[in-house]
Amino acid sequence: MRYLLLSSCLFILASCSSVYKNLQPATGDINYIQKFKPNFNNALYKAEIDVVGHHLSGLLLIKTLPDSTVRMVFSNEMGFKFFDFEFKQNGDFNALYVVKQMDKKPVIKTLKKDFELILLLRKDTQTSYLRKDGNSLYYIFPKQKGSFCYITDLGGSEMKTMEISSPHKPIVQAIMKNYTDGIPDTIGITHTNFNFTIGLKKIER
């Protein structure tokens, strides 16, 4: 079914909603979160993306190049390309190609941040900090407005969810589940303030 992949991802995200109030200071190594950084050497996903009133489905190829640049190419199954992004090791980002319907600065900026979240990029450990509640550890990386937050169980063995927050509330929630050889089988991203969702399911090759 057309929305089956997105619906399953959003169900998981809805069950992982984070509450920032009542968090307590926690001790630990902020870099420990890097154990969950996906190893996208060459991964292919079935993708469904709802963005700016368009439903797009196809294949998303995520590949790490020899210089550690991560390349993301989203196309339909006939080979028509929707976008081609690259994320440099030094933090630079390039939109090498974007189809006309998506070639809008807010859309590209949003996709950039969403993918930076799941790639575990933009991590300034000088300003980052740990918090906890009764069930979870929160690895918080402040940015200009809000923060990137990675939430694990208290033992740090499972990534529960990832969030981009405004100063007041989460505005993006994401999950990565069922890792094999460092590659997640399922990835879901949803925005809480408007209709912008991404659902990915790994294709075995």
Residue ranges of predicted features:
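An acidic-aromatic
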Residues: 71-119
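Extended lipid/amphipathic-ligand handling interfaces
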Residues: 60-62, 85, 174-179
